[in-house]
Amino acid sequence: MIIPDSQEIIEKGYPKNKSGQTYGPDLSDYVGSVPDLILAESEDGIKGYLKKTDKDSITSSSRTLPLYLQDGQTKIAELTLKTK
């Protein structure tokens, strides 16, 4: 699993995977955009990437979403998001 350096993202922008998806921690306050794959951590402490499109589509009060490697295809864990 690759986690890009925050300072490098601020200086050069988010890296892209082979599919052209950007990935990394959400540094939108510094770079003005959210990556396609957002760094997240499961309840079990597994770090992975949450697809922005999955997160944006949440409509229920609780939803379990897959976490992926930076390739955006290899599922490694699940994350339960809760909305208010």
PLM feature spans:
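Extended, alpha-helix-rich binding/interface surfaces that flank or overlap catalytic cores
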Residues: M1-K84
